[in-house]
Amino acid sequence: MTKPNHELSPALIVLMSIATGLAVASNYYAQPLLDTIARNFSLSASSAGFIVTAAQLGYAAGLLFLVPLGDMFERRRLIVSMTLLAAGGMLITASSQSLAMMILGTALTGLFSVVAQILVPLAATLASPDKRGKVVGTIMSGLLLGILLARTVAGLLANLGGWRTVFWVASVLMALMALALWRGLPQMKSETHLNYPQLLGSVFSMFISNKILRTRALLGCLTFANFSILWTSMAFLLAAPPFNYSDGVIGLFGLAGAAGALGARPAGGFADKGKSHHTTTFGLLLLLLSWLAIWFGHTSVLALIIGILVLDLTVQGVHITNQTVIYRIHPDARNRLTAGYMTSYFIGGAAGSLISASAWQHGGWAGVCLAGATIALVNLLVWWRGFHRQEAAN
């Protein structure tokens, strides 16, 4: 992939961060609205959870089958095309009259919103080596802020005009972002000689042959499962007694998560300095402890907010560290590395959504917290029992 004479200016970093956040946000507008959507379509909580799962499975499919195209085609054209297609998926969601149609719209939106994961390696390619971790951290902060603020925006818009308004507005914003990206991004032509089947095959071969990639992918999978377990069921908790909050108030809890995400930005800088194993160990410990505060959240809003802050801080910190580490493996194949890592990441998210909805259905908030804490403990043990020693040695 040729590198153009194009300075990665602060303005371009901001544009790419906003675009990344806006793209990935399209998968999460539904989360604070699940209770309202479930009542609209007469669904159970577990059935409504499939809406979020469909978006994440669509995203996982896009990561595997579309993101590698960033190593094959000119990136600006690819990014703009996928942004417009994601906007089209949200139009289907906004006009849906059945659960099946809504799942189709959210799955298509998820499939093409992986444009966010083509923007991240593009930023890493344009950045100088000594600032790569910092730039990746900034772009990834935009991504997680998009996930979290999506809930706040969705709740506020739903209060103003109903849940469909959320998706109409989001579709227009994505179309406008496509125009901004066309004007702002540099052209980058591919130099790979691989065809599409070979490109996909190389994703699997990299995953099989590189233990660091597999390790980081597993950590990401389990970490994002934790994230989804919390956020999928939280709308049900807050809409029920003793809280009885509206969609707008539920969405405001995304601000606490956004604050946690912003606090994780230095993780990329620590990884640049060779401290990735320390950041990972500390982050996974905090992730486990966060579930104690979250458990008390069934009676205390303050405890829930503290738990959200800590969980989102650690999820984002570990994620930034993971990506900074894997981008060092093959600098000329960052889109394929992203595909392998992020496919695992969002499979974890989809599994977490299903686990969360089922845990809420059968065990209430205590069941959700038990599921989250168990997966956090497994994640820590997997890392502690061997993986971190090898990476520290490397």
Curated annotation (Swiss-Prot):
<dbReference type="GO" id="GO:0022857">
    <property type="term" value="F:transmembrane transporter activity"/>
</dbReference>
<keyword id="KW-0812">Transmembrane</keyword>
<comment type="similarity">
    <text>Belongs to the major facilitator superfamily.</text>
</comment>
<dbReference type="Pfam" id="PF07690">
    <property type="entry name" value="MFS_1"/>
</dbReference>
<dbReference type="GO" id="GO:0005886">
    <property type="term" value="C:plasma membrane"/>
</dbReference>
<feature type="transmembrane region" description="Helical">
    <location>
        <begin position="291"/>
        <end position="311"/>
    </location>
</feature>
<feature type="transmembrane region" description="Helical">
    <location>
        <begin position="50"/>
        <end position="70"/>
    </location>
</feature>
<protein>
    <recommendedName>
        <fullName>Uncharacterized transporter YgaY</fullName>
    </recommendedName>
</protein>
<keyword id="KW-1003">Cell membrane</keyword>
<feature type="transmembrane region" description="Helical">
    <location>
        <begin position="243"/>
        <end position="263"/>
    </location>
</feature>
<keyword id="KW-0472">Membrane</keyword>
<dbReference type="InterPro" id="IPR036259">
    <property type="entry name" value="MFS_trans_sf"/>
</dbReference>
<feature type="transmembrane region" description="Helical">
    <location>
        <begin position="100"/>
        <end position="120"/>
    </location>
</feature>
<keyword id="KW-0997">Cell inner membrane</keyword>
<feature type="transmembrane region" description="Helical">
    <location>
        <begin position="364"/>
        <end position="384"/>
    </location>
</feature>
<feature type="transmembrane region" description="Helical">
    <location>
        <begin position="337"/>
        <end position="357"/>
    </location>
</feature>
<keyword id="KW-0813">Transport</keyword>
<feature type="transmembrane region" description="Helical">
    <location>
        <begin position="218"/>
        <end position="238"/>
    </location>
</feature>
<feature type="transmembrane region" description="Helical">
    <location>
        <begin position="138"/>
        <end position="158"/>
    </location>
</feature>
<feature type="transmembrane region" description="Helical">
    <location>
        <begin position="166"/>
        <end position="186"/>
    </location>
</feature>
<keyword id="KW-1133">Transmembrane helix</keyword>
<dbReference type="InterPro" id="IPR020846">
    <property type="entry name" value="MFS_dom"/>
</dbReference>
<feature type="transmembrane region" description="Helical">
    <location>
        <begin position="10"/>
        <end position="30"/>
    </location>
</feature>
<dbReference type="InterPro" id="IPR011701">
    <property type="entry name" value="MFS"/>
</dbReference>
<feature type="transmembrane region" description="Helical">
    <location>
        <begin position="79"/>
        <end position="99"/>
    </location>
</feature>
